[in-house]
Amino acid sequence: MTTELTYVVITPYSLSKSRTGNIIARLMSLSDCDLVGIRMMRPSDEFVDEYIRRVKSLNIPKVGKALVDYIDQNLRRENILKQQNRCLFLLFEGTDAVARIYDVVGKLTTVTESEANRGTIRGTYSDYVTTPDVAVRYFEPAVLLPTNLEYAKNNLEFFAKFGFIDSGIYEECSEGETTLVILKPDNFFKHSVRPGNMIDMFSKTGLRIVGARMIRMSAAQGEEFYGFLRDVFKKKLKPKIVAQLRQGMEGLFNFQITDDEFNAMAEVINEKNALYEFSQIVKYMTGVDPKDVPLADRDKPGKHLALALLYRGPNAVETIRERLGVTDPAIAAEGTIRSDFGQNIVQNAAHASDSIENAVRERKIIGLYDDAGADCRRIIENWLKVNGGSSMHLKEAARIQGEL
């Protein structure tokens, strides 16, 4: 049993049909693998040409031509659906990850052969319809992925070198405004449908995902991202401190304490209290207490993983926040994400920018503004260094397991 790295590419058609959330939910909850990388892609013609060459060299029986034709006709910027060729690249890590992910996805089979595929992603979302003389009438694989470790290594190396050469952010795919959503760390503490189901709920807005990145906020990023909350806490929490002082000191002294005196005492405590509450939020988002982080380590990635997504479309900021719900899950409207998935005002499922200006500020802090970073490439390259690149010819990889 070895720790493996594998990938899933969600096709442009699956993205356009808002199937992304459900696909991610199944992969994360059923595979027992960790989602360690994510990136939007718009393949170039050169990338598609090489991808086709690789698939052809596998000599996959039965489904090979249909797959080649699909890649050729659907992944190019000029395609038969006349839509943006956005794909979503997902990177998974885990014990026997290639086989586990493939089991969740399912095989490429015709409608008449699909009995064994029930319950899989392809059993739900893919189509492979043929005529009586076995000509392909309609083909949609839903996702693309490797079926054995050697082919995974080979193609991961290919993606790392040629698949992530642009920004990974495609705001030109839709008119309107762009807003930032962060699915918070508690959604990733265990393998769960939560992240995927939340993405599925956001999809009901009709907005498009135009960028994505797995993030580990550093202490410095966390403090910059949430820095404004220190003043908010000082203003909002002072009345609560006054009330607690009144309650705690009631009957302690044989003299009257005035309102001004309670306010003066609260002022002394207020700064410390605001700093504590602020540190708790940063600790939750990063996994490290900023007070305990040495200066030399403040820019190092934190311990907690979160998922940052860019949504774009008309009135994106307001639309996303309406779907998310108010800060406190206890009073959030039923049917909102925070009502369904939030626990308290800190662990409230997700963050969403409250203005276009703040979306820009926050995107710059987490590194999802000019580009989506090089995380996927770095993860792949580091894994290949430890586990070795592909030493097997593509035809031999095909012989081991067959279809994609």
Could you describe each region identified by the protein language model?
Residues 1-404:
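Non-catalytic terminal and connector segments of soluble metabolic enzymes
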